[in-house]
């Protein structure tokens, strides 16, 4: 109890000192936007992992870090290079069909479905199909979609989603690609077909399917292989999903209606098999994380780190939309990388001396499956036990005034409490994720820190369900997310960006100055990773 009281006291002191400053104090949004304008310029060519455009962006970041007086913290100066395997589908030499009652029913790649090339797909597959509901096994809730099923030699068909009585972060964890495949593979499956629930799709299928035109990647080192035994991986268009269920006694519409109530779905064999022929083009490449250090000043705590992370990669040059082929990624995530640079610059000018050190981490390969942070978390350039927290900044969307802050991971660790204190000191309300079904908690780089036992969270400008602000966010996702229109021509709320920067900076300072490390909450599912790490 005494330790907890001391922790709260230190937090209140740090927050109180910070709250005396009129917000925003350190930022005006303009310097942040100046960084964004460089990183999201057409000259950076969309910052595809391993591309010349990304290397140019990283060179710029390193130059800015040097100007801010930060020390290199990579394995080669500011850089930590990782090896990747890139896979691209050759569609003209690939095909897909259903086989029903001995008859071939061809499917159109791109229109009906597309291959996921994150997997080293088998050249040819023909296998029976089984619908397995959400495809989840969650022992903490005594929930198992696969109970009693024999999937040996079969391909599992799943509808993305989760049952209602499973908390958001827990459901998100088990819906991660690696965890879901681990469960299916253990049951004997050789492949997986995922169907997006139209109610939770961020972008329309027409844009989602463009992913097939870009190479997927994986880390080349076998230690990172989480797709063992997966011979086939497909995404299926919800508008075409009825074809899968013909003659099964169930319709796709029926399943969607059950999923609306987040009830457990029926499981049943389908009347068709899947037949696939795949040709892949593979190549090896390298890409780097950029890492810098601001040393702390306390004799003991300077050996511990608060990590600020943001991914710098985006989608590169791709299929044109309205004549534009450059996917600039201004909000996703030049905005986050720019914020780290702006905070680094502000600390250079600040007389404030931090007790803990700050690690600025700009990761590659996020758009390819959180690969850069996955590599760093497994091979950190500092003592892994020295990292006390990760504050991840990814697509925080300052497109409406910042009145409400959404904290992903709010209830999982002390970090959530600290974020709430700092935000409220700036007159900003806080909410947990209002749409846990979108699985944002596991869809960005904080997740790899969490899996290594390090308390972590992400935050974004928030909106309440049904509000005008939420409508603006939904329109942004539909029109700009993973599209060339996420560029420098979109409306941006600079005061919102500045205030968000103040909150991130304030949270960072609170963690850096607190004599105690952030702890996982006793009832957090993710606490087990800290225990496994021996902390």
Language model segments and positions:
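N-terminal hydrophobic or amphipathic helices/low-complexity stretches enriched
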Residues: 19-73, 240, 247, 303-305, ...
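Metal-dependent peptidase/peptidase-like ectodomains
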Residues: 106-107, 219-252, 363-472
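Acidic/histidine-rich catalytic neighborhood of metal-dependent amide-processing enzymes
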Residues: 173-179, 183, 200, 316, ...
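Extracellular/luminal Protease-associated
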Residues: 109-224, 230, 295, 325-328, ...
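His/Asp/Glu-rich mid-to-C-terminal helical/loop segments that flank catalytic regions of hydrolases
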Residues: 345, 349, 466-530
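Second-shell loop/turn segments in exported
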Residues: 21-26, 42-52, 94, 116-120, ...
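Noncatalytic luminal/extracellular "stalk/propeptide" segments of secretory-pathway proteins
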Residues: 45-163, 270, 286-287
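Long, well-ordered, tryptophan-enriched scaffold segments
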Residues: 190-191, 195-199, 214, 218-287
């Amino acid at each position: 109890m005494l330790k907890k009281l001391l922790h709260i006291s230190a937090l209140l002191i740090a927050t109180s000192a910070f709250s005396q400053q009129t917000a925003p104090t350190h930022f005006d949004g303009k310097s942040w936007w100046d960084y964004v304008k460089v990183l999201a310029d057409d000259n950076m060519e969309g910052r595809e992992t391993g591309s010349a455009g990304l290397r140019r962006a990283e060179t710029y970041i390193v130059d800015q870090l040097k100007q801010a007086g930060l020390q290199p913290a990579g394995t080669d100066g500011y850089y930590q290079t990782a090896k990747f395997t890139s896979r691209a589908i050759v569609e003209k030499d690939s095909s897909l069909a259903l086989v029903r009652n001995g008859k071939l029913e061809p499917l159109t790649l791109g229109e009906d479905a597309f291959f996921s090339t994150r997997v080293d797909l088998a050249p040819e597959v023909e296998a029976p199909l089984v619908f397995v509901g959400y495809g989840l096994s969650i022992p903490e809730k005594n929930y198992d979609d696969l109970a009693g099923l024999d999937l040996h030699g079969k391909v599992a068909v799943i509808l993305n989603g989760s049952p209602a009585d499973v908390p958001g972060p827990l459901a998100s964890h088990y819906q991660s690609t690696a965890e879901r495949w681990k469960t299916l593979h253990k049951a004997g499956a050789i492949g997986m077909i995922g169907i997006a629930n139209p109610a939770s799709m961020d972008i329309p299928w027409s844009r989602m399917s463009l992913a097939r035109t870009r190479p997927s990647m994986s880390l080349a080192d076998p230690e990172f292989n989480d797709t063992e035994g997966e011979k086939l991986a497909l995404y299926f268009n919800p508008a075409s999903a009825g074809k899968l269920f013909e003659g099964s006694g169930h319709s796709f519409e029926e399943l969607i209606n059950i999923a609306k109530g987040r009830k457990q779905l029926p499981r049943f064999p389908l009347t068709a098999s899947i037949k696939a022929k795949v040709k892949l083009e593979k190549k090896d490449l390298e890409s780097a994380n950029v890492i810098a250090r601001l040393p702390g000043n306390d004799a003991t705590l300077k050996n511990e780190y608060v990590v600020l992370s943001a991914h710098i990669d985006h989608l590169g040059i791709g299929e044109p939309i309205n004549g534009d082929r450059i996917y600039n990624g201004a909000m996703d995530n030049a905005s986050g990388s720019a914020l780290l640079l702006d905070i680094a610059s502000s600390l250079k000018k600040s007389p404030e001396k931090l007790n803990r050190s700050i690690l600025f981490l700009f990761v590659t390969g996020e758009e390819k499956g959180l690969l850069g942070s996955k590599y760093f978390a497994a091979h950190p350039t500092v003592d892994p036990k020295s990292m006390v927290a990760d504050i991840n900044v990814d697509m925080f969307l300052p497109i409406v005034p910042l009145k409400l802050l959404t904290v992903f991971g709010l209830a999982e660790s002390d970090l959530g409490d600290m974020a709430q204190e700092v935000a409220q000191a700036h007159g900003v309300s806080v909410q947990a994720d209002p749409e846990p079904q979108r699985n944002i908690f596991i869809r960005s780089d904080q997740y790899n820190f969490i899996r290594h036992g390090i308390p972590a969270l992400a935050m974004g400008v928030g909106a309440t369900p049904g509000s005008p602000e939420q409508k603006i966010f939904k329109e942004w996702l539909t029109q700009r997310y993973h599209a060339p229109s996420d560029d420098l021509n979109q409306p941006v709320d600079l005061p919102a960006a500045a205030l968000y920067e103040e909150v991130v900076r304030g949270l960072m300072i609170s963690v850096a100055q607190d004599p105690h490390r952030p702890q996982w909450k006793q009832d957090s599912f993710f606490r087990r990773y800290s225990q496994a790490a021996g902390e």
